[in-house]
Amino acid sequence: MAKFDPRNLPDLVRRPILTEKATIMMEQNKYTFEVTPKASKPQIRAAIEDLFQVKVVKVNTALPPRRKKRVGKFIGFKPQYKKAIVTIAPGDVDKIRQVLFPEV
């Protein structure tokens, strides 16, 4: 298991990813987050459990390739990010939905 400081856990999760595919996966208790590229699966699990007070069943990660971005004649790259697909225990789905989608 990776060593990490519990005080830095909230910094690992940047934002939730809300796309059409991610919304469909929410019906299967899978939530997608953008995390820091150097975060490991145990760190992501601990961060999600700490932030949302839920039980994480499984963590899948993907490191998509960087995309090129052109500004005038210069070619650069968009910043690299890591995508984490987190499976939540069926009993804890209401807790995470209340935090991510508060009722107005």
Curated annotation (Swiss-Prot):
The keyword Ribosomal protein applies. Pfam families: Ribosomal_L23. InterPro entries: Nucleotide-bd_a/b_plait_sf, Ribosomal_uL23-like, Ribosomal_uL23/eL15/eS24_sf. GO terms for cellular component: ribonucleoprotein complex; ribosome. SUPFAM superfamilies: Ribosomal proteins S24e, L23 and L15e. One of its GO terms (molecular function) is structural constituent of ribosome. Signal peptide: none annotated. GO terms for biological process: translation. Keywords: Ribonucleoprotein, Ribosomal protein, RNA-binding, rRNA-binding. One of the early assembly proteins it binds 23S rRNA. One of the proteins that surrounds the polypeptide exit tunnel on the outside of the ribosome. Forms the main docking site for trigger factor binding to the ribosome. PANTHER family: 60S RIBOSOMAL PROTEIN L23A (PTHR11620). Belongs to the universal ribosomal protein uL23 family. Part of the 50S ribosomal subunit. Contacts protein L29, and trigger factor when it is bound to the ribosome. This is Large ribosomal subunit protein uL23.
